[in-house]
Amino acid sequence: MLNSVKKLLGDSQKRKIKNYEQIVNDINQLESVMETLSDDELRQKTVAFQHMLQNGKTVEDIKVEAFAVVREAAKRVLGLRHYDVQLIGGLVLLEGNIAEMPTGEGKTLVSSLPTYVRALEKKGVHVITVNDYLAKRDKELIGRVHEFLGLTVGLNMSQMESIDKKRAYEADITYGIGTEFGFDYLRDNMASSKAEQVQRPFHFAIIDEIDSVLIDEAKTPLIIAGKKSSSSDFHHLCAKVMKTFQDTLHYTYDAETKACNFTEDGITKIEDLFDIDNLYDLEHQTLYHYMIQALRAHVAFQLDVDYIIEDEKIMLVDIFTGRIMDGRSLSDGLHQALEAKEGLPITDENQTQASITIQNFFRMYPALSGMTGTAKTEEKEFNRVYNMEVISIPTNRPILREDKKDVVYITADAKYKAVCAEVMNIHKKERPILIGTMSILQSETVARYLDEANLPYQLLNAKSAEQEADLIALAGKKGKITIATNMAGRGTDILLEKGVHELGGLHVIGTERHESRRVDNQLKGRAGRQGDPGSSQFFLSLEDEMIQRYAGEDVEKLKKSLKIDENGLILNNKIYDLINRTQLICEGSHFSMREYNLKLDDVINDQRNVVYKLRNNLLNEEVNMIEIVIPMIKNTLTVIAKDHLLEGMLPEEWDFTRLVEDLKAVLSTEEIPALSANNVHSAEDLQELLKDTLTSYIERVNALESDADAQQVLRQISLHFLDSGWTSHLSAMQHLKEGIGLRQYQQEDPARLYQKEGFEIFLHTFSHFEKEVALYLARYITVPQNI
């Protein structure tokens, strides 16, 4: 069997497969040995492995025997034996890479191997699934194997109590969805004591459907937000103004990146309407913020594609799955701008208190691996961003699905009529049909055409999400026609009814190319699972969104030379080159956007790491707070000197009165040496004059070292000022990000400017935090009983 692996995989992977082949042979040779062991003897292997690791052996040293142990345990507990290709998948994951395995090839069983080996290190292993149902299912299934071998297994779910979460994280292996692990990380970094934190340091994670998590959701930030009031009238006014703006004249919109900005004419119009001189003045920052969000709501978000309205509320739709993101809202006033656009009541605005992107969250794991059926097309990105390779694992059974050639029509109307004709033809044979669509809007369009053709169907989109499991279970029945958005793709199985195999299995129809070949492959993969028969075909048109967005001009040039039949079908083969090229351009554009956004997010990620490191230090009650605050006092004095002893001004022009007042406040004394242009010509002069005063004050501060109450007060107040400052800083960075795109017109690199100006904002935020702590300490020393 392993010889056939070499033929199935490309030359680039042959060396790796050779290595895996030898390791799998070694594992197989141990199978008969493991079969002779009693349950207790097999369980004792876990203890032996742990001792070996504690005494200097590595995971590499024990992996062969450990894999053999897990295989034997799975046979006894589940009645399932790992195939050779599943062992290869486990080895790929153990190395921190991606195992590409089609759905139905037993990825869940594969994950049992590396999770066991890495859990032996007693540092915790996280298994990430795409939803709570799968996390619970996999924990209960594979967890039985690991518990049989003496390991502990936990489940991390939303809405769990902190004590239960802590228990889940203390387990050797913890299952859950990625966003919940991310939110726990943010909550831990908002905790007011160490006891409230639930996570251990990150060690090793395996992500199921890794492409969905690390590619599709890469830009999605995890946000913990508080509420702040928002001006309902102002949002409605800006929405009303926006309706008078014209594309190109007043604003630009890049459909590829969904980036929008005001033109000079647009800026002038805003300034005239609101009777202001310069929109970019600091005093008009709020107006600019409301207007740019109104613009985004107006042009970048489409009803029944990006969101739906339910009970007078905006419900966001996940564009990757088609599911409603219940409880999620857009931040920084964009959600309110959408409400104003649709004439809905304005809700309170979310103010970000903590955030992190999926990308930067998972990059914190020292070792990361994953499984998916579709990752090879994104291998470059996985390698560049996460330093992971994609290894294609062959199927245990051959794939019988027939992927038919795409058909391309001149108009969308001709395409949908052809889809109806195809559905009618296949429906007569009683084969089940799944029609995949890009959005709610498109699924309802397809439904209208099927209604006109009197074809029965089930419609499955975000508006019918609660019926998803029931509807998808029926999709493999004889004569069943199912229209589905992307939501029907992952985490659900279409089981073929008895007799459907003989009819040819499930037929999948794609109604539009997705913006990634990977997502197209996911749709095709709904048919022909686990060796079932099946087929797929895409019906496209030159009016499809991807074609119009990325190749509109090319299409117009090409139209004159196209041969078209009476049904609107394009007969020229060169149209396929255009479509394939367009999809590659689209993929490249999205990759570039993710790369650009990662550059921007890396700036705030570095800042977050500094703040969270300090915060965890503050939470540590063994840390002496006096050792933390004394440098803050000295830094604050340096900043005060810099603020008052301004370069480019003569000492006679410096405001010594204000300087003395600020120094008195920080040093908690009225006895500041006389300061004037006569004795202060530089910061060094000031430092020398304040030497004795500062020494005396530091002695008073050091006296608090043995005062437990003072230590606790300083700890809590420092946390308060740090959290408050960080919340304000996140808002400032968001506003900087909003305006940074405009700098392109000034021939400046936006990413570099964001880094430079973001660093300046961060320095200001940090200085302000240190000054607040220093001032509080000065007041506390003076009158501690009143603070």
Swiss-Prot record:
Monomer and homodimer. Part of the essential Sec protein translocation apparatus which comprises SecA, SecYEG and auxiliary proteins SecDF. Other proteins may also be involved. This is Protein translocase subunit SecA 2. It is found in: Cell membrane; Cytoplasm. Coiled coil: none annotated. Part of the Sec protein translocase complex. Interacts with the SecYEG preprotein conducting channel. Has a central role in coupling the hydrolysis of ATP to the transfer of proteins into and across the cell membrane, serving as an ATP-driven molecular motor driving the stepwise translocation of polypeptide chains across the membrane. GO terms for cellular component: cell envelope Sec protein transport complex; cytosol; plasma membrane. Its main location: membrane. GO terms for molecular function: ATP binding; protein-exporting ATPase activity. Its EC number is 7.4.2.8. ATP binds at residues 86, 104-108, 493. It comes from Bacillus thuringiensis subsp. konkukian (strain 97-27). It holds the Pfam family SecA_DEAD. Transmembrane segments: none annotated. It is an enzyme of class 7 (translocase).
